[in-house]
């Protein structure tokens, strides 16, 4: 669970919540084969009921700083819809302990779990990342998550990948919901040809320049090196175009590039 045990003292990570949203039985696992009950057992927690299960969450979140984890990540777009509005606690309870709950029970279970985690994250000022766009494509557009974001105004949401192909929808939400930040991760790799236009739109729409940042989403060092080189070039080309057209000055472009590439993420995750 502690990334520094594997990679060294300069690293921090986020805690992926998928297995918790799918943790109705010992047999249930997320798409990476992670088991919630096995993970909780490693932390010394053995819930016997669904209510016990929910009561483990504050303890899990309170342990994150000691494990050098700086946020939560919801990548459930690979497992299910990103709509989390079925907050039926009784239906969620009925999923507990079943090897194969009904689709309605599974959704209610996950909805209650994710909503609870979002609330707890907001109370602790823990950022909450969400993968949007690709995955199970029919349920991964940004507006599917609007209810979750509205119910948790204290939670800082980082919505990833520019929600490609729904980038304009995502930017519209970020204009309305001031607890949304934008992660450009992977979006320029998916479509380098259209990325400059989407970046320009983000610059136009976002309420302030602190709300956009960058990640890599790569497996290997060589891939990360190539990806960061590509996005630096695309950002420079886009900002140079803004300067030529008189949208802002060269020093403004220089400041914005630093914020996108480093400063905004450091501030968002409260990094030193």
Regions found by a protein language model. Name each.
Residues 2-6, 21-24, 79-83, 136-137, ...:
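Short catalytic/ligand-binding loop motif for oxyanion handling, primarily in non-cytosolic enzymes
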Residues 208-210, 225-272:
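Mid-to-C-terminal alpha-helical segments outside catalytic/metal-binding sites
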Residues 1-20, 70-77:
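Divalent metal-dependent hydrolysis catalytic cores, especially in the metallo-beta-lactamase
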Residues 49-73, 81-180, 194-213, 231, ...:
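Histidine/acidic residue-rich metal-binding segments in metalloenzymes
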Residues 16-22, 75-79, 133-135, 162-165, ...:
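Active-site beta-loop-alpha junctions enriched in small/polar residues
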Residues 14-18, 184-188, 210-216, 249-255:
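A generic structural motif
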């Amino acid at each position: 669970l502690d990334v520094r045990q594997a990679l060294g003292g300069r690293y921090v990570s986020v805690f992926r919540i998928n297995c918790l949203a799918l943790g109705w039985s010992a047999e249930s696992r997320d798409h990476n084969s992670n088991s919630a009950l096995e993970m909780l057992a490693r932390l010394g927690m053995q819930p016997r009921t669904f209510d016990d299960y929910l009561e483990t969450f504050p303890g899990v979140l309170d342990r994150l700083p000691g494990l050098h984890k700086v946020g939560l990540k919801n990548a459930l777009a690979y497992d299910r819809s990103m709509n989390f509005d079925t907050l039926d606690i009784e239906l969620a309870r009925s999923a507990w302990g079943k090897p194969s709950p009904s689709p309605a029970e599974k959704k209610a279970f996950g909805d209650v779990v994710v909503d609870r985690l979002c609330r707890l994250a907001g109370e602790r000022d823990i950022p909450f990342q969400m993968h949007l766009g690709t995955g199970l494509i029919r349920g991964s557009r940004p507006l599917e998550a609007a209810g979750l974001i509205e119910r948790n105004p204290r939670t800082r949401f980082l919505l990833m990948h520019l929600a490609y192909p729904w980038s304009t929808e995502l930017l519209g939400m970020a204009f309305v919901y001031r607890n949304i930040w934008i992660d450009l991760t992977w979006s320029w790799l998916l479509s380098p040809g259209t990325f400059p236009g989407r970046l320009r739109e983000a610059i136009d729409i976002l309420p302030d320049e602190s709300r956009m940042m960058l990640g890599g989403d790569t497996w290997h060092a060589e891939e990360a090196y190539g990806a960061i080189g590509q996005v630096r070039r695309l950002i420079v080309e886009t900002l140079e175009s803004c300067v030529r057209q008189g949208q802002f000055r060269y020093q403004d472009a220089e400041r914005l590039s630093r914020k996108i590439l480093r400063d905004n993420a450091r501030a968002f995750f409260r990094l030193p």
